[in-house]
Structure formats: structure tokens, C-alpha cells
């Protein structure tokens, strides 16, 4: 019988933990640590103690310390089906010093290894979901009932129900934050007062109390009075200078504005004249070119028809002379207009240079006016006058625009006449072509006649030569030739008749064209004269308007001058009022100086009182220091607790936002399900109607309906799963909110009780544990931390979770493929159907 292994404290260190369950001797002779080794063991080892007895288990440090310490999970959590159950017993506290404070922590149940059951039932959620999938193959009516019930449930559970408690807790947290802020401000004020008291005490100790001497104050008072008198004198002089400068600037501004407006009006008038002259110049040049073209055409016609009568030549020469006279007169007018334009352009340039100089002077004067900060009202009125003048200028520009429109209309009419003239020219050219063709035909007939005559002569000579040889043959030939000659003579007469008819027609066409050209020329001359008289009248009207505008401008200038004189008088009155106000200010200053002297006497009395108070404050300095220490310790504790409460409040806000977003998402999904349900019912009704109508497509419709049923069943099952998951998450978030709010309430009650208690006694037995070291991972040199050594059970659960996750992922992927396939198949079947 082998001896039992040594299970004492020192012997247990040489054993190694194995997943099978038995312990064997560690061959490395190295200290091995169990993941459930307690903190007390390390403390005992540090102190050199080796006590045997039952050891308490300690949980490993993990990421969920905060959740476990705040009791986030209760018995109804969503993880209770897959995690081992907890015993209802409370965990023992390892720290003995914490029991001396009078606050027990046994009511907080921690998720320790000792509280886990061995044979706790574990659920299989994937299997349950498969069973639910088989059970939930219901029709559309059940789906609608469930959707309506869920909607009613969600409408009943509002934020005004259970969430009002968490909102009240948030309000309490906000109040505690404000209290902490006020306490901190009071603490800082007390600290500043204490520093001031210490500084005043040190100064009073160093400097002995001396009698107050008022000679310096009296000197300062006299100096201030002298300075005040000097400044008032300077102010008066400056005001006189400013008034003088304002008068000067106003006069200069008025002169410059008058000059500027006059120059602008002159420039605008000159520009309008130049524009009109340019327009008339362009028109005259176009008319000149047209007249030249007409003269050229008439000259060509004269050269072509010089064989005609002398009367037409004389008429044409007269027309030519008239046109030359009109051209020479037009050229003279163009030269005069160009000379006027050059003169006007030079005048405009001079005016622009003068305007630039005036504008530079105006800008300089405006800068002076801005520096003086006066006469804004006059400037505004002048701006208003300038705006009115601008309106008048706009009206003139509109009139000019109307005149331009009239000129454009006249140009259009001229273009129409030109097009008509071109048409006549084209007709004339066609007639000429016809005449040329007739001439060519005549020439060809003449050449044929000459050839026939030549042949006749040759035949006569042959007849004379061959009279003796073959008289009969020659006589026959002579007859044939005579008949041919007769035919040719008849053709010649016909051609002559055609030539005469063509010449008559040509003469009539020439006379008609000449008459039309002469009438058009007369009309154009009449129109040009009418337009010239019209433009001269418009120019005279514009000149009269210019004279009227200049007269109105002079009247307005006189009005503005009268207004400026009135404003100067008002300015003098205001200056006198300001001088009176300055005298009143002097009196007030003297009264204030008297009051200051009285305050000085009272301040000396208060200084003596303050010296007495200072002596009293020195005595109470030690008591303030003690109180300050107590307040600082309390403030540090409160700041730590406030940081903790702030972090928990941030978590609560995040969870609340998650809850609201989840709720909205659920409502949206339910609405979409209802819409799908209605569309399903409509499709079912349509399918039933179509099945009664078309018996031939019964097999195809049955397959499509089966596909549709499979598709909507799969989709319905997926939505049910999704809704279940969302409901579980919603319940979990509600429980977390409830637990966190309860924990916050407890913490706040603790804080209130600790603040209401008197100062903490400075004893060794009392020890506040703000940061519990029990859950902190402990490391030893050369070893892995126990928090990183997983147990066999944890690894097995992790593997099982991974397998289940893989199975669910494969099933979800398969469902998605199936839904996609059915959707495509339904779409193809719908495309096949022909209504």
C-alpha cells in the first residue's frame, strides 16, 4: 500500500493540475499554481506562515469583472440555458479589515468556481430552433395574428413604463454632479481665502501699524484736476478744428459732387452722341457700298445693252450722275462724322482724365470725412440724389435702347429690300442665259446654212460636169437637193421668227427690270431722307432733354446748398450744447472727488476693523487647516465615486440608445412583414382566379405555388428567428438597465451615508478599500499568469460553441442560397406567363 501523497501546503505546490482529475508528482520540482488559488495564500507566504486548512477559491481575472461586480446577470438571463447554474449561497470575503467598517458584502453573489454545480443541465439552442422550424409552418392568417399581437405589445411597452425609473436615476446623478461641482468651488474659495489670510498675517507681522498720511492723495487730486482742465482745453480746441475741417470738407464735397455729376452727364451725352454717330456711320457706309454695287451693276448693264437706244443711255447717265452726287454727299457726311467722332473721343478722354482726378480727390476727402466721423446725414442725402440721377441715366439708356431697336428694325427692312433686289438680279441673269442660248442656236443654224450653200454649189458644179454622163440621175439628185434646200429654208425662217420673238421678250423684260430698279432706287432714296430727318429730330429732342436736365441739376444744387447752410447752423448749436455738457461733467467730477475723500475716511476706519479681524483669524487658522484636510480627503473620495458613477451613467445612456434603435427596427420590420403578408394574400387570390381560368397551366402553377410557399416559409422562419433574437436582446438590455440603475442607487445611498457621517477617525483599525485587490491578476517571475491558463471545461465549451456557430453559419448560408434560388425561379416563372 503506497503512502498517500502529501497534501499539505508545501507538498501541494509540487503537484500539477491535470484535466483528467488526479494529481501526480511534478518532476520539475517547480512551484505550480492552480487557477483557483487564493490571495490569502500569497499573503501567508509573504509573511512566512504555513497554515493548513480548507482553501477558498478565487475567480480568475477576466474582461467581465465589472459586469459580475455590478450583478448585471440575474437568474432570468439569456445565457442561463447554456452556462452552469449558480448556488444561492453568498461568497466569503477574504479581507478581514473590511468587516471592521461595519458594512457587510455577503449579499453580493459572485460568479465563483465554488458555486458552480457539477451536473447542471445544458440546453441545445440549435436543436430547439430546428424543432420550432417544423412547428412554425403555418399559413398567412397565423402570421397576421402574430404581427398584430407583437405590434400591440410594442405599443403598450413605452418609455413611460419601466424606463421612468432609469430616467429618475439619471436625474439624481445629474443632481449629484451639481453638488460635487458646488463643493469643489467652495473648497477652492476656502483655499484662496486661507492663502490670503496667511499672506495678510505675514505682512502684518513684518510691517508695523503706521498712521495714514493723506498728503499723497491730495497731491494726486490736484494733479488730476490740472490734467482735467488741460484735457478740456485741448478738447475745445480740437472740436473747433474739427468743425472748421468739417465745413471745409462739406464745401469741397459739394463742389466735387457737382463737378462729378456734371462731368458724368456730359460724358454720358457725348457717349450717346458717339454711339449714334457710329450707328449712322455704319448705316451710311453700308448704303455707300450698296450704291457702289448698284452703280457697278448699272455700268455692266450699260456695257451689255449699249447697242440699244440712246434714250436709255441718257437715262442711265442721268441716274449715274445722281448716284455719284449722292455718293459724294454721303462721303462728305462720313468725313464730317468721322471728324466729329474723333473730336468727341478726344473730349471723352479729357473728361475721363478729369473724372479720374476728381474721383481721386473725392476718395481723399472721403478718407478725411471717415477720420472725422461726421456729416453722415448729408452724405446719405447726397447718395440719395446720386441714386435719383442714376435713375434718370437709366431712363436715358432705356430710350437709347429703344432707338437701337428702331434702327435694327430699319436694318431688317433694308435687308428685305436687298433680298428682293437679289431675286430680281437672279431673274435677270436667267433671262440673259436664255438669250445666250438663243444666240448660240442662231449661230448654229447660220453655220448649217453656210454648209448647205457650199454643198449646193458643189452639187451644181458636179451637175454641170456630169450633165452629159447621167442626166436622169442628176435630175433626180437635183430634185432631192431642192427639197432639202426648201426644208432648210423653212427651218431658217422658223429660227429667225424664234429669234425675233426672243429679242422682243428680252426687250420687254429689260424694260420691266429697269422700271423696277428705278422705282426701288427712288423708294430707297425717300427712305434714307425720311430716316435722316427722323434722326435729326431725335437728336434735337435729346439736346433739349439735356438742357432740361442741366437746369434741374442746377436747381437741385441750390437746394443742397441751402440744406448745407442749415446743417452748419445746427452743427454750431450742437457744439454749444457739448460745451455746456462738458461744464456739467466738470461739476460731476468735483462731486465725485468729494465722495472719494469721504470714502477714504471710511476706508481707514474699515482698515482698523480688518486689523482686529486679522488677529482673530490668526487664532482660527489652525482649526481651518484641520477642516481643510478633512474636506480634501472627503473631496478625493467623492471625486473617485463620481468618476465611477459617471462611467456607469455613460453605459446606461448607450444601452438606452441601443434599446430605442432596436425597438424602432422591430417596428419597421413588423410593418414590412404586414405589407408582405397583404401582397401574399393578393397573389394567392390572383393564383386561385387564374387556376379556375386556365386549366392548361395547372401543373406549372402548382410547381410555382409550391416554390412560392417554400420561399415564403423560409423567409417567415428567418424573420421569426430574427424577431426572437431581437426580443431576447431587448429583454437582456432591459435587465441590464434595471441592474445598473439599482447598483447606482445603492452607490448613491452609500455616498450620502458617508457624507452625512462625521469626520473619519484616524485609527489603524479603520481602512477604506477603494480599489479591491482581490480581482487583480497576480504574477510570479518565470510563470504564466493563472488568468491565461484555461481549464479543460472552458476549452471544451469553447470548442462546442465554435462547432455550433459553424453549424448555424452553414445553415444560414444554405437558407440564403435556397431563398435566392426560389426568388429567381419565381421571377422566371412570372416572365413565362402571358396574360
From Swiss-Prot:
Residues 182-690 form a coiled coil. This is Spindle pole body component 110. It comes from Zygosaccharomyces rouxii (strain ATCC 2623 / CBS 732 / NBRC 1130 / NCYC 568 / NRRL Y-229). Pfam families: Spc110_C (PF18520). Keywords: Coiled coil, Cytoplasm, Cytoskeleton, Nucleus. It is found in: Nucleus; Cytoplasm, Cytoskeleton, Microtubule organizing center, Spindle pole body. Residues 74-91 have a biased composition (Polar residues). The keyword Coiled coil applies. Belongs to the SPC110 family. Component of the spindle pole body (SPB) required for the proper execution of spindle pole body (SPB) duplication. Potential role in cross-linking filaments or anchoring other molecules. It is essential for growth. Residues 687-703 have a biased composition (Low complexity). Residues 1-59, 73-105, 685-706 are annotated as: Disordered. It comes from the Eukaryota. Residues 96-105 have a biased composition (Basic and acidic residues). Homodimer. GO terms for cellular component: cytoplasm; nucleus; spindle pole body. Gene3D superfamilies: 1.10.287.1490, 6.10.310.10.
